[in-house]
Curated annotation (Swiss-Prot):
Biological process according to GO: angiogenesis; cellular response to fibroblast growth factor stimulus; cellular response to hypoxia; extracellular matrix organization; gonadotrophin-releasing hormone neuronal migration to the hypothalamus; negative regulation of endothelial cell apoptotic process; negative regulation of neuron apoptotic process; neuron migration
Record's protein name: Protein NDNF
Annotated S-S bridges: none
Signal peptide per UniProt: 1-19
Organism: Mus musculus
Alphabetic keyword roster: Glycoprotein, Neurogenesis, Repeat, Secreted, Signal
Assembly mode: Binds heparin and chondroitin sulfate.
Tissue: Expressed in brain and spinal cord with no expression detected in heart, kidney or liver. Expressed by neurons but not by astrocytes. In the brain, detected in the cerebrum, cerebellum and olfactory bulbs. In the cerebral cortex, highly expressed in Cajal-Retzius cells. Also expressed in hippocampal neurons and in Purkinje and granule cells of the cerebellum (at protein level). Expressed in neurons along the GnRH migratory route.
Glycan attachment sites: 322, 488
Phenotype of gene-disrupted mutants: Knockout mice lacking Ndnf are grossly normal and able to produce viable pups. Absence of Ndnf in 13.5 dpc embryos results in abnormal development of the olfactory system and defective gonadotropin-releasing hormone (GnRH) expressing neurons migration to the hypothalamus.
Gene giving rise to this polypeptide: Ndnf
Length: 568
């Protein structure tokens, strides 16, 4: 098998070539080998101009080899750790006189050179230990057999290697701008806005670049593959093959596939991954997320948690080569949740409260005098609102309130009441709240169970309509208003205007029909009727009835649309 790979290496060394100094690149053969990832995974040969991904078992070194045929050859080698720190070194074993380019086509001589380098320690050119993306670059390298040795002492890990003899023309990694930092331009409780300088690879060289943003709570990442390794830590990709199977321990094609698939055509196991350049939203893990945003260099991250430290990394990906470069990441702590201001309620005084959609509001009621009972009148002007009442930390009440509700609680000397209001998902809410220890004097106007306005169809004329509504046993003032509306006025439009807290003072004087007092001790007879005159034939009108209580506080009945007859 080893001889077979060295034969493949020989195919990359045509004697007539004088430009490439690593295995000379036959483009057609090179592209074929790029597609066949198994060639790289199984081979210890580094091809010229292609990124190799492979795996390291802990404390088990891995060696790669490549040949440089001529002196004064440019050479660049880049190693990218994808998880654990690596120890790696690059060594050179000079060629013997009998192993010149004239004899480079003989696989036996190449095999001898490799064996000599294994047996005899060569000249160390470069070494590094850490988890940074590090590279060796030489504008003039001697001919010889080069060995790259990698070791992971912490844990099993994987990495990437890229080598080329044409570093100036290849440029597969996107170039960083003169200022490679990611800037936090603004941040709040749940959002952070990031900005960075565009890559010259996109702005000057006009190569396709995509930016990917990685957000996590632990630390910044130095490479995109390190971030993706963290995201995929639970995937089968990291599961080592089971012992006893016929596999090369460094053959990545088997990793992550069940045993019953190992006998299938290996070409099915080596399908190329999708281009990173597409708009891919990775399935987020617990504390890390990657979002690719195209060629924009400003991005706002939302839905963050308040008072939490986040780390932000930006990677630019060359969508032609699928290779990436990291900006210098940033971190910031989001702002604390704004402390809720508590509204003080005065005994017997109506307080207007506005609650944002899904928002919260806190109110406090501390009666000055001793009391036996406390009454809360809560008027939800539109949609339902969740109400909680606590006294000295103890929960007394928790209900959804729609319309007008009255709650009477047993009092306690020097008791302090905390009211929490929580808005719903539909939209913002407006309420009127009255807390009192003397409910008989400061009650909201009482309402019947049915607050609809009924129109009598048989009593309709071209200029009038007759309507009726229910009252209560308490003598109250009722005011009725009318407003002409379009014939296609819908129920949805009517609901949008159904703010029960808007009183008669918000209506035009021309819309007022009349006001009258009404009550009945017999609830069965607590019905009043009214005929509204001076209307136009065939027109639609919106009718509203308001009941006014002590202190001028009013409540609106459900609106009613009526239509006069067109022909009489």
């Amino acid at each position: 098998m080893e001889l077979f790979y060295w034969c493949l290496l020989c195919l990359l060394l045509p004697l007539t070539s004088r430009t490439q100094k690593l295995p000379t690149r036959d483009e057609e053969l090179f592209q074929m080998q790029i597609r066949d990832k198994e060639f790289f995974h199984d081979s210890s040969v580094i091809p010229d101009g292609a990124e190799v991904s492979s795996y390291l078992f802990r404390d088990t070194p891995r060696r790669y080899f490549f040949m440089v045929e001529e002196d004064n050859t440019p050479l660049s080698v880049t190693v990218t750790p994808c998880d654990a720190p690596l120890e790696w070194k690059l060594s050179l074993q000079e060629l013997h006189e009998g192993s010149s380019a004239d004899g480079s086509g003989d696989p036996e001589l190449l095999d001898q050179q490799k064996q000599q380098m294994t047996d005899v320690e060569g000249t160390e050119l470069f070494s590094y230990k850490g988890n940074d993306v590090e590279y060796f670059l030489s504008s003039s390298s001697p001919s010889g057999l080069y060995q790259l040795e990698l070791l992971s002492t912490e844990k099993d890990t994987h990495f990437k290697v890229y080598a080329t003899t044409t570093p100036e023309s290849d440029q597969p990694y996107p170039e960083l701008p003169y200022d490679p930092r990611v800037d936090v331009t603004s941040f709040g409780r749940t959002t952070v806005t990031l900005a960075w300088k565009p890559s010259p690879t996109a702005s000057i060289l006009k190569q396709p670049i995509e930016y990917c943003v990685v957000i996590n709570k632990e630390h910044n990442f130095k490479s995109l593959c390190a971030a993706e390794t963290k995201m995929n830590a639970d995937d089968a990709f990291m599961v080592a093959p089971k012992p006893g199977l016929d596999f090369n321990p460094f053959d990545f094609a088997h990793f992550g596939f069940p045993t019953d698939n190992l006998g299938k055509d290996r070409s099915l196991l080596a399908k190329p991954s999708p281009k990173v350049g597409r708009h891919v939203y990775w399935r987020p893990k617990v504390d890390i997320q990657k979002i690719c945003i195209g060629n924009k260099n400003i991005f706002t991250v939302s839905d963050l948690k308040p008072d939490t430290q986040y780390y932000f990394d930006v990677f630019m990906v060359n969508t032609n080569t699928n290779m990436s470069t990291a900006y210098v990441g940033a971190f910031v702590r989001t702002k604390e949740e704004a402390k809720q201001k508590t509204v003080e309620l005065k005994d017997g005084r109506v307080t207007d409260v506005f609650v944002k959609r899904k928002g919260k509001k806190f109110l406090r009621f501390a009666p000055v005098s001793s009391h036996q009972k406390v009454t809360f009148f809560i008027h939800s002007c539109m949609d339902a609102v969740q109400v909680q009442v606590r006294r000295d930390g103890r929960l007394l009440l928790s209900q959804n309130v729609e319309g007008i509700r009255q709650f009477q609680l047993r009092g306690k000397p020097k008791g302090k009441y905390l009211i929490r209001l929580k808005g719903n998902r539909k939209g913002a809410s407006k309420l009127k709240i009255l807390a009192t220890t003397r409910p008989s004097k400061h009650a909201f106007p009482s309402l019947p169970e049915d607050t609809r306005i009924k129109a009598f169809d048989k009593l309709r004329t071209c200029s009038s309509v007759t309507v009726a509504w229910l009252g209560t046993q308490e003598r109250r003032k009722f005011c009725i208003y009318r407003k002409e509306v379009d014939g296609n006025y819908s129920e949805d439009q009517k609901r949008r205007e159904q703010n029960q807290c808007l009183g008669p003072d918000t209506r035009k004087k021309s819309e007022k029909v009349l006001c009258k007092y009404f009550h009945s001790q017999n609830l069965q007879k607590a019905v009043t009727t009214e005929t509204i005159r001076d209307l136009q034939p065939g027109k639609s009108y919106l009718l509203d009835v308001y009941v006014v209580g002590h202190g001028g506080h009013s409540v609106k009945y459900q609106s009613k649309i009526v239509k006069t007859r067109k022909v009489c």
